[in-house]
Amino acid sequence: AESCELTVEAVSNLLLGASVDFYLAMNLDGIATLNDMAGGVTVTLEDDFSTLDSEMAQGATITLHGDQAEIYVRSRRNLEIGTNEARMARQEQYMAKLFAQLDTRLQSDQNFSGVLFDALSPYLTTSMSRGRLINTAWTVKDYIRSEPLEISGEHRVGSDGFMQFYADEASLYEAVLDLFYEEAK
């Protein structure tokens, strides 16, 4: 919970003091469970994962089940293209398909959000009660999902020796205005 609270503080600071009321984090060990609760996610493999799973050859279209989902969204070191950009593109593709399937399940089964929460609870850290989370899932099921918001900036090695992202100030202000404010009429 402490790492989540530190993240809430960091995100609030990044977003120019915008309030972050709740948090929910999932341990990566929950990817397989989440994937399988959605019924598996079908993808066409642009990278070759066959050294990790023989069914995951480049060019194949497969429905990811169990550990295959984690291999798909996390792997980069065992691939010829070991960059994070390729992995991030896969993650965006995967999440779009996963969310669409979860939305469908939420629309068709009023109890699904509770079942999903119970299945994922060993992997979750959240400041939300079970009831609030279920009610929120039920409320947002009818929302129209917008494209992920991207803040421009640059990546460079920080004083600690690790790669860091430095947000473009104008892009950041624009994002905060888009997310948290409505134009006066």
Describe every region a protein language model picked out.
Residues 1-56, 127:
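Amphipathic, coiled-coil-like alpha-helical scaffolding segments used for oligomerization/assembly
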Residues 22-25, 71-72, 148-150:
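Structural recognition of the beta-strand scaffold that forms the well-ordered cores
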Residues 29-112:
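Flexible, polar/acidic helix-loop-strand segments at domain edges
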Residues 1, 10, 16-22, 77-86, ...:
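Second-shell loop/turn segments in exported
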Residues 22, 49, 99, 112, ...:
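Phenylalanine-focused residue identity feature
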Residues 60, 64-67, 123-185:
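C-terminal solvent-exposed extensions
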Residues 28, 48, 77-78, 138, ...:
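Residues that form or immediately flank small-molecule/cofactor binding pockets and catalytic motifs
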Residues 4-12, 28-32, 36-38, 66, ...:
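Extracytoplasmic/secreted envelope proteins and their assembly/folding machinery
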